[in-house]
Amino acid sequence: MSVKRNKKVSVACVHCAKSHVTCDDNRPCTRCIRKGLEESCIDAPRKKVKYLRDVPEDQLPSVLRSTKQVPPVNAVKLKMEPGILPNIPLDYDGGTIRQSAPANNGKNNPETQQTLSNGQITHRPKFLSSAADLEYSILSDIIHGDSLFNKIPVNFLYSNPTEKTPSPINQGSLNGQQDLHFSLQLRSKPMNQIRGNTRAIYSNLLGPVSHEILQSEFNLYTNHFPLQPQESLDGTLDFKRMTIGTLSPHLTKFDKTINQYYLNFANTFPEIYDSRKIPNLSYALEVEPPEYREIPHDTEIPHTLRFTTPSEIYSLVQTAFPSTTGFHALLRYLKRRFDKNQLVEMCRCLAELRPIFIASTIDLTDEDMIFMEKSHQRTLLEYEKFISQVGTPTCVWRRNGQISYVNDEFSLLTGWNRLELLNKMTFIVELMDGDTVMEYFQTFTRVAYQGFRGAETMRICNLLTPIKGSVIKCCCLWTLKRDAFGLPMMIIGNFMPILTLPEDVGF
């Protein structure tokens, strides 16, 4: 005589799951009816994957939510009364939806599947992702000699990162009101106060044409203008405080004893102008307000940390990062700075990466590239909390060399503050001398796709400062972070200065 066993179900109720017993498809189930637990017999919540644990249930896409949703008790009572339920609209209270979603929300649309299937078959000979395809194309252009000097593609498949994303409400999303609420909160932040005045920051750091660049309508996030060290007569960074409209030292006198300019000219009070005072010997440390030291979270800056919470990252990042724009700008910058022989050596290093890049990205779709950007933003948000507590000068940049984050110690070491590096498209090679740039590409080749031990030290590392001719000799340790597909996502560089003692100092 065989024992009759209950049929297993995919989702058990909360009581059966807690007791680790077999449940059935009925709600309430047979066991809960027998124990008098009919009212609380609902499906047990499924365990979320690791990267979605921080996202609330109501902010997840419909395909990632539980397909079986039980409305609250109040909704069940209203449903029993005729003539009331059809007039109840969708109501958001405390971030939850009172009226349950349709039962077919979790099902796939056959038409969409057919479209996706056709797209995959069509793009099978090339990359499945337009972002990966375009990134590989510019990498090939850098490697080939003819295209290195003559051909630069100008048609991008990316949308402008500064354009506002359409509201999900128009697309019929149940989370449209919440996404709009997040967007309004981000746009209402006084970002100009944190980012400072762009004209004041770059008034004398973009070379002789700084004024023309700042007066034009160029976007500093998508157009690259390299930083240029300036002459400093006294060896200090006081010239960075000279903004547009500052009084000329030839017209008025500056008294160092009181740290002020004279408002009158020399012929007004000549006895005061000619008087010489012994300056008081005093020193002070300049400390910026906390809001100026914080990393600028701005949705309009594509290369740095754009959001402050994980839920904003997962719900509002809807496009892949335009790495191709950065590769184009990097190519133009290298062509202006180095000769042909040096460029050939750099291209030789990049040529070793091309076949491995193809094998790693040939099957990635646009959705995968968007997921990679979400992973980058989420990882950078976590690293920002950790790096801010460590006293080591640290700089984080993407695989195309664009700087994404610097801490206060890096600014103290190099003299480049955070606003100067993050308020525009800035590459890490801009802060290196010629020999260090050559070592940069060789180190990147060693750590990108070859046997990587977790950390790599650059053989040569000399950082440029805002003062022309001033170089800081450092020891640089690389730590490469890969994404879920094995591609280099970000590089964390730790810089420690190499201090040399004067020859006349002995022990």
From Swiss-Prot:
Disulfide bonds: none annotated. One of its GO terms (biological process) is gluconeogenesis. It is found in: Nucleus. Transmembrane segments: none annotated. Keywords: Activator, DNA-binding, Gluconeogenesis, Metal-binding, Nucleus, Transcription, Transcription regulation, Zinc. Residues 97-121 have a biased composition (Polar residues). Gene3D superfamilies: Zn(2)-C6 fungal-type DNA-binding domain. Residues 379-451 form the PAS domain. Transcription factor which regulates nonfermentable carbon utilization. Activator of gluconeogenetic genes. This is Transcription activator of gluconeogenesis ERT1. It comes from Kluyveromyces lactis (strain ATCC 8585 / CBS 2359 / DSM 70799 / NBRC 1267 / NRRL Y-1140 / WM37) (Yeast). The lineage of its organism: Eukaryota, Fungi, Dikarya, Ascomycota, Saccharomycotina.
